[in-house]
């Protein structure tokens, strides 16, 4: 069963027409963008070991551009032949590609490391609540790229005996920048919005403060100005090379407040 939200408070079972019928005993399921192409894929754990007829032990469904799914061959799951009860996603090597941990019925759980080799980009977002709970559970994250939104809802348990990473994964495809990231804090009905977020980084957004940490800001900055904030003084920047430079100004919370692209010989 795959229940598609119709947007009016009702759902429709689209498992057969989308190719996600799981002819076995399903225990745990998780959506993930395994190849960061912006389309969510699906992994399902099963209660059989694959030795009984055509009953699947598990299945990975790769989403196509027409909202259908296929089970690809020779991508590493051929030995996924254990009875399992749950699964969860995280990023064991911080490369931006979601990995899968599977809880099997006996010892020796499976850890499936994502070896995708494409050049698609990604963004990871972690929340830190202040008025709401510290882990940011129960809130909505929206990113917007190329006229299209993606959403994640932070949870404290995605399935039976399973918990995903607190980092929410977004596949960006070929996009190198996210137009904006918006967090809606359910408990207070407030929003934090940050604009022009670079791809291929992990950021933490603190309730009411915007970006708390940003790998991109910390590691790719040529200079910092102090005191910050300040309201007096003039800073002059000279660019005398042929490279295309970008000037970005952030406040102490990591929020982008000013940006100029394509600085050359200025």
Give residue ranges: language-model regions.
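Acidic/hydrophobic-patterned starts of short beta strands in beta-sheet-rich repeat architectures
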Residues: 36-45, 95-103
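A short loop-to-beta-strand structural motif that recurs across blades of beta-propeller domains
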Residues: 1-3, 57-61, 110-112
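C-terminal outer-membrane/trafficking sorting elements
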Residues: 146-150, 176, 216-266
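Short loop/turn segments that connect beta-strands within beta-propeller blades
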Residues: 6-9, 64-67, 115-117
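Beta-propeller blade termini
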Residues: 4, 26-36, 85-94, 113
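Blade-edge beta-strand/turn elements of extracellular beta-propeller
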Residues: 9-19, 68-77
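Conserved loop/turn at the beginning of each blade in beta-propeller domains
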Residues: 22-23, 80
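Gly/Ser/Thr/Pro-enriched helix-cap/hinge segments flanking short amphipathic alpha-helices
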Residues: 50-53, 68-220
């Amino acid at each position: 069963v795959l229940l598609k939200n119709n947007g009016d408070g009702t759902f429709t079972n689209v498992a057969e027409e989308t190719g996600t019928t799981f002819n076995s005993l399903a225990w745990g399921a998780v959506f993930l963008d395994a190849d960061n192409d912006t389309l969510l894929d699906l992994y399902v754990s099963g209660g059989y070991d694959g030795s009984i007829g055509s009953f699947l032990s598990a299945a990975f469904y790769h989403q196509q551009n027409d909202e259908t799914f296929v089970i690809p061959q020779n991508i590493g799951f051929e030995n996924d032949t254990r009875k399992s009860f749950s699964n969860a996603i995280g990023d064991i090597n911080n490369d931006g590609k979601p990995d899968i941990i599977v809880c099997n019925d006996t010892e020796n759980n499976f850890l499936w490391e994502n070896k995708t080799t494409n050049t698609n980009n990604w963004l990871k977002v972690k929340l830190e609540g202040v008025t709401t709970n510290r882990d940011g559970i129960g809130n909505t994250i929206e990113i917007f790229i190329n006229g299209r939104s993606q959403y994640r809802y932070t949870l404290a348990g995605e399935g039976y005996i399973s918990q995903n990473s607190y980092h929410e994964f977004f596949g960006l495809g070929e996009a190198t920048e996210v137009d904006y990231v918006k967090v809606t804090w359910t408990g207070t009905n407030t929003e934090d919005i940050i604009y022009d977020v670079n791809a291929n980084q992990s950021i933490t957004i603190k309730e009411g403060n915007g970006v708390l940490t940003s790998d991109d800001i910390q590691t790719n900055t040529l200079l910092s100005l102090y005191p910050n904030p300040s309201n007096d003084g003039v800073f002059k920047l000279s660019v005398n090379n042929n490279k295309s430079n970008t000037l970005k100004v952030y406040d102490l919370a990591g929020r982008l407040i000013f940006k100029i692209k394509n600085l050359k010989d200025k």
